[in-house]
Amino acid sequence: MDVDQDAKENKKIKKSPAKKSPKQASVTKKPLASQSASVANVVYDSALETAPASGKQQTKKTIQKKILPKSALPKIVAAKKEPPETSEKNTPPKQSKEIPAPNLGSAEFSAIAENMAELVDQGRKALGAALGGVDGGEARSELAASVADATKTLGFVAEYWLSKPERAAVEQAHLYRGLADIWQQTLLRYSGEETPPLVIADVGDKRFASPEWQENPFFDWLRQSYLFTSRWAGDLIDKTEGLDAQTRVKAAFYTRLISSAVSPSNFVPTNPELLRATVEAKGENLVRGFRMLVEDISAGHGMLKIRQTDEDKFKLGVNMANTPGKVVWRNDVMELIQYAPTTSDVYARPLLITPPWINKFYVLDLNSEKSFVRWAVAQGLTVFIISWVNPDESKAEKGFEAYMHEGILTALDVIEQATGERKATVAGYCVGGTLLATTLAYMAATGDDRIDSVTFFATQVDFSNAGELQIFFDEERLAAMDEGMAKTGYLDGVKMANAFNMLRPNELIWTYVVDNYMKGVEPAAFDLLAWNSDCTRIPRANHSFYTRSCYVENRLARGEMVIDGVKLNLNNVKIPIYELATREDHIAPAPSVFRGAKLYGGDVTFVLGGAGHIAGVINPPSKDKYQYWTNGPVVGEYDKWVAGAKETKGSWWPHWFQWVTAQAPQKVPARQPGDGKLTPLCDAPGDYVRVKS
C-alpha cells in the first residue's frame, strides 16, 4: 500500500545508528573531494582542449544565452554574471573544496582487506539466498513477462521517434545542448567562478540533500546531468503521439523505474556521501549492509523484502492493534472482532468494517493515537472489524464469492447474534470496499436489506482509469502470475509489496537500498511502515477473479459481473452512501472514485480528503492535519466538482460521524463482547493477524 505521505511526515524521526563493530574505526566527518579530484581534473583538462577559443568569457556568454527551450529543460535557471568585488588581477581564482588523500597505513589496509573479504562472503550468501528461495521456473516466468512488457511498451515510444529521423534529431539536439550547458557551467566552477546550478532538484527529492552534491563541481555535474537527462526522457513520453492511455502510463512507469535505478546517488563511486562513508569505515558499512541484504532476501524466501523500519519495536496487541476487544467468530476466511465500548450508551446500529486483504486490518488500529477504530468506539459506536486470513495453499480456491459469503454476509449474521440488531452500517476500505460494493449489488438483487447505509474509503468500482496499479494487470503479466500461483496456491505478499514499492521507487526502494545496504544503517522505527511490511498472501482464485473482472474487464461498472449466477447492477443499490476519495491517491485515484460514485442508484455524499491512500484516510482529528472538501451531488466532471468545493481544515472523521449517526440516531445501553449469544474466542487483535507471510 501507499505510505509515501506519512513517510514524509516521519522526517523528524532520526535513523537509529548502526551498531559499531569493534573493528570499526572512529573517524570525524570532513569534506570529500580527494576521492573525485583526480577524475575531475582529467576530465577538466581534456575538455579545455576543445573549449572555445575565446575562453572563459565566451563560455559565460554561451550559458547566458539560455540555448535550451523551457520545454526541453524543466526548472532550468540561467546563470547570472555577478560583478567582481575586486579586480581579477588581485583575486586568485577560487578552488573547489579538497582534502588530502587519507593516510593509510598497514593496519588500515589490513582492515580494508578483511572487510572486502567479508563483503565477498556476504555477497555469496545473498546470491545463495536468492537462488535457493525461489522456484526457478516461476521466477523466470514473471521476470520474463516484465522484461517483455517493458521492451514492448518502450518500443512503441522508440518507434514513434525513429520513424522520422528529423523528429528524433530535434530532441537529441535538446539533450546535447542541455548537457553542454551543464558542462560549461562546470568548467566555470573549476576556474573559480561562482555560478548557480542550471538544473534544480524537485522539492522533496532527498537523494541529493548532502551539501557535497553542490559544493564539489564534479558531483554537481553528475547530479545536474542526471536530473536533466531523466526529465528529458520523461518529456519524450509526454510528447509521443499515438499512444493509448494505458501504454502511456506504462511507458512513464518504466522510464521512471529506469531513471530511478541509474541515479548516481545509488552507487558508491558516484555518491559523495556513500564514498565518504565507505572510505572512513574502510568498507565496513558495506559489510553491514550486505548482512542485512542476506537477511532480507531470506525473509522474502528468495525475493528481496526491503526492511523499511525496525519491526522489532512494534508488538501486536501491545503498541499496535491494541484497542480492547474480543474475537467473537472465526471461519476459514476471517476472524470477526468486536471492540469493547468506552461509553455508557452506544448507538443501536452497529458498524462493520471490511478492510482490504492485501494488507492487514490494523491500518485502522495502528496505535492509541492513530486508530480509527478506537476513535469510533469513543464516539459511542459498536465496532466490528473483519481480520482476513493470511492464506496458505489450502485456501487456493477461496475466491471473491467465498469472501462475500464467508466474510461480509456471515459477519452480518454474527453481528445480529452478538447485538440483536438485524441491520448494520458497513464501511469498506480499498479492495474491501470493492467487495462491499459487489455484496451490496448482490443483496439488492436477492432482496437482502440488512445493510441500511454504507461508507467507502478510497474504493474503486469503475476501473476504466484505475491508476498506476493497472500497470501490473495486463494479460501477459496475469498469465505469468497464474503460472506462479498454480504452484503455490496464492500470490506471495512480498510480490504484492514490491509492486506497490515500485510505484514510488525513489522513496520506497532506493532510499532503503542506499541507507540499509550501502550505508549499513538500520532504519528507524515507524509504525505505518511496520504495518506496510507486514504483508499478506492472497488466494489464487480471489486474486485471479478480482484482477481480471475489475482491472482488465471492468465488469462491475459495466453491469456484467456475475456472482453465484446473479448478474450485478450497482444502480440497484439505493441506500445512502458516504464516499471518501483522497486527492493524492495513486492507487484509487480520486477522479476514478468520483466516476464510480455515479453508478449507484441512491444518494451519495462525496467527500475529498487531503493527502493519499493511507494518510488521507488515517487522519485523526487530534493531529489537526490536512483538510477535506465537500460539495453537492456527484454530477458532472470531477474537476468542476473540485473547483466549486468548500475546503475545511483538519480531519474528515467528525464530518463522517455526523453523517453516519444521522442515518440511525437511536441509542441503547453499551454492549460488551460476549453479552449476546456468542462466546469470545480470544482477545483482539486475534490469531489470523499474527500469521506471517
Task: Describe each model-derived feature in a short phrase.
Residues 579-581:
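Short beta-strand/loop motif that positions the catalytic acidic residue
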Residues 347-356:
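Short beta-strand element of the alpha/beta-hydrolase
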Residues 589-599, 610:
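Short alpha-helix in the alpha/beta-hydrolase fold that links the catalytic acid
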Residues 1-333, 346-347, 384, 596, ...:
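Amphipathic, low-complexity, repeat-rich surface-exposed segments
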Residues 418-431:
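Alpha/beta-hydrolase fold nucleophile elbow
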Residues 397-418:
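Alpha/beta-hydrolase active-site loop
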Residues 365-383:
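Short amphipathic alpha-helix adjacent to the substrate-entry channel of hydrolases
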Residues 240-277, 417, 421, 439-543, ...:
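Alpha/beta-hydrolase-fold enzymes
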